[in-house]
Amino acid sequence: GFNSEELPLSVLEDILNGGINIAKKAGIPVLGGHTIKDKEPKYGMVVTGSVDPNHITRNDTAIEGDLLVLTKPLGTGIISTAIKQNKSNHDIMHEAINSMRELNKSAMEAMIDVGVNACTDITGYGLIGHLLEMCKGSKVSATIEFNSVPFMRGVFELAQNGIVPGGTKRNLEFAKKKVT
């Protein structure tokens, strides 16, 4: 989404060039796109590809005893919400932006090297939502040691002040019956 009435087109150009540069780093072509008018700038990409069926790693193939490895600290959703509400300081904002800009390529390469059984991303359903999905599909259970989970700086303070995405509240409502 882009609001050309409030933002100069040079901002849109910078956003698009940034996406193209990251796609080049990832070794993928950019083949098209679309833009919608929206008050709030939004940018995203969809990647389509093919994979050897013998090398697919899914989210429903975990095995009891597997370790859970997070490749980035949690908290971008909360910090993004704080940014939208003008309640994030400069350092915390840039830490979240830098995390979101970082490719997962090295994590993917490490995953292949060690031969993981399953993987998933942590997006809108949060750690608990995605872990519940993985456990249900794999017919396993999981234990999380809270103090071992990496979080971005400032996330707890923001959450304590009620700055959380709307989806977080829905995720909690969904998960509280399934998590002890």
Language-model segment annotations:
Residues 2, 83-95, 160, 174-179:
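Active-site phosphate/oxyanion-binding loops
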Residues 41-43, 47-48, 73-74, 100-104, ...:
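Long, contiguous hydrophobic alpha-helical segments, chiefly transmembrane helices and signal peptides
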Residues 34, 60, 71, 96, ...:
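Glycine- and other small-residue-rich loops at beta-strand/loop junctions that grip anionic moieties
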Residues 46-56, 91-111:
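Active-site glycine-rich loop that binds ribose-phosphate moieties when present
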Residues 6-29, 36-41, 113-114, 119-180:
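Glycine-/charge-enriched secondary-structure boundary and capping motifs
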